[in-house]
Regions:
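Walker A/P-loop phosphate-binding motif and the immediately C-terminal alpha-helix
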Residues: 1-37
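Generic beta-sheet signal
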Residues: 1-3, 33, 84-89, 145
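Short, well-ordered alpha-helices that flank and scaffold nucleotide-derived cofactor binding pockets
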Residues: 19, 23-27, 49-50, 105, ...
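Conserved catalytic-core segment of NTP-binding enzymes
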Residues: 34, 92-178
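Switch II (G3) loop of P-loop NTPases
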Residues: 39, 80-100
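Residues in the short beta-alpha loop(s) of Rossmann-like NAD(P)-binding domains
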Residues: 39-41, 151
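P-loop NTPase switch/communication element
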Residues: 41-58
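Conserved nucleotide-sensing/catalytic segment adjacent to the nucleotide-binding pocket
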Residues: 55-89
Length: 179
């Protein structure tokens, strides 16, 4: 399986959740894992290098990949598609980034972190609709959305906010799985 962590909104915890999920699969589920940082910021890969300096036995490495060239990105994805195990990819924060279409075309899942503020909701909704337009233009894109609410505390929120959040969740459920 190829799992992308993607959202065009920055600060939603995409890289952090990608790392947590990778740790879970590696440590708890003992899954054969390849982790790739395709985000130009290379935050995940940089953190993992720091980890490897402090620890001897890290359970997995994070490979840095540049996706600026769609042709080479397509070749990388075809290679990944043929591998056993699970590939986790931390993606750039923009669908307009060269190579994103190739990532999406070969993914099984798009894990899309979000949180309940208007800017994030609007940006995440725009991201969903942009991916849906890409799916229409490129039918080979079959990836299923998994939405992960981040920075959510069940003890917080007025009645009106809770109702608004429920509407947001219902909207996201139309397009994928709400985790």
């Amino acid at each position: 399986k190829i799992i992308l962590f993607a959202n065009q909104k920055g600060g939603v915890g995409k890289t952090t959740i990608c790392g947590l999920f990778s740790n879970y699969l590696s440590d708890t589920r003992n899954v054969s894992l390849l982790v790739i940082d395709a985000d130009p910021q290379q935050t995940f890969a940089s953190r993992r290098k720091d980890d490897s300096r402090r620890q001897k036995d890290i359970p997995y490495n994070v490979q840095s990949v540049t996706i600026k060239d769609p042709s080479s990105t397509r070749n990388i994805m075809l290679t990944l598609r043929g591998l056993a195990g699970t590939t986790i990819i931390d993606t750039p924060g923009s669908l307009t980034q060269e190579g994103m279409k190739e990532l999406l075309a070969n993914a099984d899942y798009i894990v899309c972190p979000y949180h309940y503020d208007l800017n994030t909701i609007d940006s995440t909704r725009a991201f969903i609709l942009a991916v849906l337009r890409l799916k229409q233009a490129y039918p080979q894109i079959k990836a299923q959305f998994i939405f992960v609410c981040n920075k959510y505390d069940v003890r917080v929120g007025k009645g009106s906010e809770l109702q608004a959040w429920k509407i947001v969740d219902e909207f996201f459920k139309k397009y994928g799985i709400l985790a």
